[in-house]
Amino acid sequence: MRKFTDWPVTDDQLREIQELTYLGPTAFNSQPLRITWIKSPEARERLVKHLIEANQEKARQAPVNAILSYDKAWVDRADVFNPRAAETIRSYCTTEEIVTFAAQQGANLQAGYFMTAVRALGLDTGPLWADFEGLYEEFFAGTDEHPILVVNLGYGVPTQYPRDTRFGFDDVTRSL
């Protein structure tokens, strides 16, 4: 989404987005996605300096931006999110490489659920890449959260251009 109206996105809507996002399945029910809502002008300026120039104004005018991150410490909460399999999870996740890979995979999956939840509630999304190392230093330094995606959200202004081509079934699937 290139432009958004000035209609506000409420805290109740943000809560509902989170709740819908976390209904989707993840391996081990791990739920490694973390969401940082960017709502203040000060936080937004800290965010936009880590975006490419073409996306900075889009982010500035969006009612809300979300930084989606994976939590490398997700295993520490296994007793909460999957108490029946907590020991299995810990026995599987024995290296930092495995823990990080699982966190990234789960958070990427949840990022898709996130954008689907936003759209299901009648809002629009604009996913953006960023300087993720810079975002880490800016917002998450010293924590186990590592950003993977920035998403602008709000009520979109219809564009004058038609939707770009989407691949068809035969272009992207095969049956064996």
Task: Indicate where each model-derived feature is located.
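Short coil/turn connectors at secondary-structure junctions
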Residues: 60-64, 123, 144-147
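Short beta-strand segments
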Residues: 67-69, 129, 152-154
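Short, flexible, mixed-charge acidic loops at enzyme active sites
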Residues: 78-88
